[in-house]
Design a protein with these regions (language model features):
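Bacterial Sec-dependent N-terminal signal peptides
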Residues: 1-24
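Early exported N-terminus immediately downstream of N-terminal targeting peptides
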Residues: 23-93, 97
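C-terminal partner/receptor-binding element of secreted or periplasmic proteins
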Residues: 30, 152-170
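Extracytoplasmic
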Residues: 40-43, 75-79, 104, 115-119, ...
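Terminal interaction module
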Residues: 83, 92, 124, 135, ...
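Short helix C-cap/helix-to-loop transition motifs enriched in small/turn-promoting residues
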Residues: 90-91, 102-107, 131
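Short Gly/Thr-rich strand-loop-strand
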Residues: 98-126
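A short, solvent-exposed beta-edge/loop patch
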Residues: 123-156
């Protein structure tokens, strides 16, 4: 009985370590992509760390239930990284940007929108036995490409609520 309990504990512990390793690997892969293109012409990068997220949350005025949900979501976010490329036509980073979701572990496509050559994809990764989740949004338009990567302790439904609230949050 002790042996079985020990095996179960070891399995749970190893899953926790693997989940944390997947998150670290994903973060490193996306950070390397940001670093590669950070000083490139026509590319803007925005990185919002935990301290700035707290400042944003502290500056919000809560007036209703939606605002309370937004505040809870903001408190659960650890970081937001955004890359925007403004350039007409296809760019050299488009293919590489859309490969990120395949290179990163655990990302699941949760929604994809395609219309007249424009594409928007949403990916979500939740790591077993870890409170860290990742959200990746990739957008390709005729004159712009956008990558948004959010990490924190949230769920798919939290991200859905964020989308429903739209510009009312930030």
């Amino acid at each position: 009985m002790k042996r079985i309990l020990l095996i179960i504990c070891m399995a749970l512990f190893s899953n926790s370590i693997l989940a944390q390793n997947s998150f670290k690997e994903n973060s490193a892969t996306i950070e390397a992509f940001f670093e590669k293109y950070r000083d490139t012409k026509n590319i803007t990068t925005i990185e919002i760390g935990p301290a700035m997220v707290k400042i944003l949350a502290a500056g919000m005025v809560i007036s209703g239930e939606d605002d309370k949900e937004a505040m809870d979501l903001l408190r659960s976010i650890k970081s937001i990284d955004i890359m925007v490329e403004n350039q007409e036509g296809m760019s050299h980073i488009t293919g590489e940007m859309f490969e990120l979701a395949k290179l990163c572990k655990g990302f699941e496509l949760i929604s994809s929108i395609s219309q007249e050559g424009e594409v928007c994809r949403f990916y979500f990764a939740s790591h077993d036995d870890s409170d860290i989740c990742e959200f990746l949004m990739l957008v390709r338009q005729a004159d712009q490409r956008v990558l948004m990567y959010i990490t924190g302790g949230f769920s798919v439904s939290d991200i859905s609520a964020l989308g429903a609230m739209g510009g009312n949050i930030l």
